[in-house]
Amino acid sequence: MKKLKKDMLYVILTALGIVMIFPFFWMISCAFRRPNELLTSPPRLLPASPTVSSFIHVLFETEVPRYFMNSVIIATTATVLCICVAIPAAYSFARHNYRGKNLVMVCILLCNMIPQASTLVPLYRAMDRLQIIDTHFGIAFTHLLCMLPFSIIMLKGFIRTIPPTLEEAAMIDGCTKLQAIFKIIVPVCSSGIFATAMYAFMISWEEFLYAMTFSTSSRARTISIGLKMFSTEFKVDWSSILA
């Protein structure tokens, strides 16, 4: 009976694995097809005549590599800024009790609920005055606004699991409050910081509206904007998108 249950579990897990992997397999298979093969009926699992023409087109005939590097720079900058701001903010909420703390936390939560579209005009005017439109830092700053509220809440939960006695012991040994944060809290909370950084990086990488609004040339356009350019009013270049 136990062996039957174990075999059934393996069958179910294998089936789930196939279901999860199949979209990636299909994407790779379609990337090696010619455009006229993509919409054939019935569909084929493997390309009839594999070709790398889509990859050559994307890598050497478009600005996708530049958009990719822009995304890496912007997402990395936004993530670093987010973590640098979120750690002290989360520490303050997790360790100190002061008047209005709960109100501030509610305001942070509400900031996460504000629709992006409603912030476009004031942000555009502010960024225009600062002359950071169509720059890596400008778009990274707008991404920071998207990811910071939830990052603070995430890190607050991780920091609250650390016993305050560790910091007290460090300060007895001569550490200042700031040194205790960077020598005790940050190393102990490294897994939580890494998880928060991954969340922030993914939010920045996938963000579309701010990147489209505040980038006016290829100098700061991200990969999400680059992929959108393969889709026009009359045609969608699926081969290039999948490549």
Language-model segment annotations:
Residues 2-243:
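A structural signal for multi-pass alpha-helical bundles of membrane permease subunits
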